[in-house]
């Protein structure tokens, strides 16, 4: 039998449920139920005894599952759960439990910075040298250079530097950047009081909240990715992924890959949002961001056709492909309406919305949910969310009702998935995909949104349960955030942490999580066919389809912990 708890802990007033799980014996019989569960202080004093309640068979894990609720324990302290001779990892009950985690999740972004030296006073033992400062070239010219048709000096060179390394590689991708930024900037917009922390970054103390200073580093890189006509390069990468070397040792040619309409629309959206967010702190940047957004929106109007992106056959870096840009265009139109107040953007947004079947997603593959956040902003911001909405025209008011209904309908659908899970996770068995933890956290953001819109505790409890899953209530028995919990994963697929020669792992990385269809050689070799999807996980750095990290897996965790940290 195994006992699964949130290894970080539980708020004094939150829902608290321990999961007990067993697999069937060789005969296939249902295991014998655990008789009792004891909630004890870490020094072994039993404080509460409960009889577990049988949930049933959990298909995603292949386990027979029991639950024991111990929500009546409120006293701050350190605890363990016992059942017969099995003991859980220690955990805390109290207040402020997510504060340090929220900080480490946010500080991860600093450790992803490209184009600058990370100094010991900010990075500690993870200090490293400046990287990727050489000029970039256009793919259209570089492929001619590779074919011997032109010389190096015949290519245009672009001094584009900065931003965050996207993931375990050293590429930087426009659509992924926009999505990660949107998660974080909206988290700041909706839960600003949770972002009063000093992240100990070079900009700390400059009069701007540290999280906004960190995001500004990425935004300033993204501004450089816009061409003279308003198009936006899809990505800035080398031809192929770097070897597992430190960033400054990756000296291969950086390439600007062609403009995609997804990148242009995402760029227009995030710059319009940034203009609103940064106006109180940096008027000049806010103005620059809005002008850039308008320029890219004009580009979209001049190019109504879908312009996708596919990797050239010579390239193996992240593709971030798509089959439509309608959701991206929707997001761009809505952000520009919210920033400028000009009704034609709202009209554009409603026309695009009416073409879509899915409207509540927050990932790079579908950004439609961000349009809903922009539209419903006054209903989600703390200073206005408790007041009657004051929309300026009938179209906006009616559209807001529709989007509110969309969010709540999707939240209720997710609640139904959670009820069917022995581990209270918002994934059906077939949804344990590459980056499954991103899906968990994106849905936690939607549940958080539903709570603010509708003030029903069931949504807050469900969002909390998703962090329980991420932090240890899962059949792999890991906390999926480095440095968070007694059994946190330690070996991300990340070039820096493998090449730096340091035994400790940078804290605050979110793992991609279990993948029912492993897609890397190591995982395919080690995970046996028929393994239940929730158990298709290995804490091995080579397993990039299970254990990579990326900015847009951290960003929904930043949002969710900001929501859970408010007034706690």
Annotate each predicted stretch with a short phrase.
Residues 190-192:
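Flexible, small-residue-rich helix->loop connector segments that border functional cores
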Residues 226-236, 304-309, 341-344, 416-420:
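Proline-centered turn/helix-capping motifs that create local helix->coil transitions or kinks
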Residues 361-363:
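Zinc-dependent metallopeptidase catalytic helix centered on the HExxH motif
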Residues 195-202, 233:
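Short, glycine/acidic-rich hinge or "gate" loops at secondary-structure transitions
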Residues 208-231:
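Carboxylate/His-rich catalytic cores and anion/metal-binding grooves
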Residues 7-84, 89, 95-99, 107-178, ...:
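Aromatic (Trp/Tyr) and acidic
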Residues 203, 207:
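Acidic, glycine-anchored loop motifs typical of Ca2+
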Residues 294-298, 302-305:
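Hydrophobic, small-residue-rich alpha-helical packing segments that form membrane-like cores
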């Amino acid at each position: 039998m195994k006992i699964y708890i949130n290894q970080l802990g539980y708020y004094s007033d939150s829902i608290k449920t321990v999961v007990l799980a067993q697999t069937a014996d060789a005969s296939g019989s249902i295991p014998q139920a655990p008789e009792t569960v004891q909630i004890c202080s870490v020094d072994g004093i039993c404080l509460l005894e409960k009889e577990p309640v049988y949930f049933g068979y959990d298909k995603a894990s292949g386990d027979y599952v029991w639950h024991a609720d111990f929500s009546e324990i409120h006293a701050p302290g350190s605890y363990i759960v016992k059942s017969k001779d099995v003991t859980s990892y220690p955990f805390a009950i109290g207040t402020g439990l997510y504060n340090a985690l929220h900080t480490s999740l946010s500080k991860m972004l600093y450790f992803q910075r490209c184009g600058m030296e990370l100094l010991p006073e900010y990075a500690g033992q993870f200090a490293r040298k400046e990287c990727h400062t050489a000029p970039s070239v256009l793919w259209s010219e570089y492929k001619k250079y590779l074919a011997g048709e032109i010389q190096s000096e015949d290519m245009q060179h672009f001094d584009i530097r900065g931003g965050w390394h996207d993931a375990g590689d050293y590429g930087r991708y426009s659509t992924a950047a926009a999505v990660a930024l949107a998660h974080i900037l909206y988290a700041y917009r909706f839960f600003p009081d949770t972002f009063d922390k000093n992240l100990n970054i070079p900009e700390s103390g400059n009069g701007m909240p540290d999280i906004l200073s960190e995001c500004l580093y990425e935004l300033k890189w993204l501004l450089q990715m816009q061409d003279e006509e308003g198009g936006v390069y899809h990505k800035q990468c080398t031809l192929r992924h770097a070897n597992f070397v430190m960033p400054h040792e990756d000296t291969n040619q950086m390439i600007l890959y062609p403009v995609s309409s997804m990148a242009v629309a995402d760029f227009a959206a995030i710059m319009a949002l940034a203009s609103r967010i940064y106006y109180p702190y940096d008027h000049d940047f806010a103005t620059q961001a809005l002008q850039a957004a308008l320029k890219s929106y004009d580009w979209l109007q001049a190019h109504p056709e879908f312009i996708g992106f596919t990797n050239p056959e010579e390239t193996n870096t992240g593709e971030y492909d798509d089959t439509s840009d309608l959701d991206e265009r929707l997001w761009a139109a809505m952000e520009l309406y919210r920033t400028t107040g000009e009704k034609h953007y709202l009209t554009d947004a409603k026309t695009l919305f009416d073409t879509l079947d899915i409207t509540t997603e927050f990932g790079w593959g579908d950004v439609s949910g961000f349009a809903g956040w922009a539209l419903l902003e006054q209903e989600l911001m703390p200073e206005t969310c408790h007041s009657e909405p004051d929309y300026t025209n009938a179209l906006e008011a009616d559209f807001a009702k529709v989007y509110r209904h969309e969010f709540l309908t999707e939240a209720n659908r997710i609640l139904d998935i959670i009820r069917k899970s022995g581990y209270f996770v918002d994934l059906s068995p077939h949804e344990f995909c590459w980056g499954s933890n991103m899906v968990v956290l994106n849905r936690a953001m939607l549940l958080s949104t539903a709570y603010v819109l509708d003030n029903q505790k069931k949504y807050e409890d469900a969002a909390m349960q998703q962090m329980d899953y991420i932090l240890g209530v899962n059949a792999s028995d890991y906390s999926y955030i480095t440095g968070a919990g007694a059994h946190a994963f330690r070996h991300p697929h990340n070039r820096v942490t493998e090449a730096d020669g340091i035994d400790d792992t940078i804290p605050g990385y979110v793992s991609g999580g279990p993948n029912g269809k492993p897609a890397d050689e190591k995982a395919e070799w080690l995970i046996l066919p028929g393994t239940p999807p929730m158990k298709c996980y290995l804490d091995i750095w080579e397993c990039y389809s299970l254990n990579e990290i990326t900015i847009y897996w951290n960003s929904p965790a930043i949002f969710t912990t900001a929501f859970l940290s408010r007034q706690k």
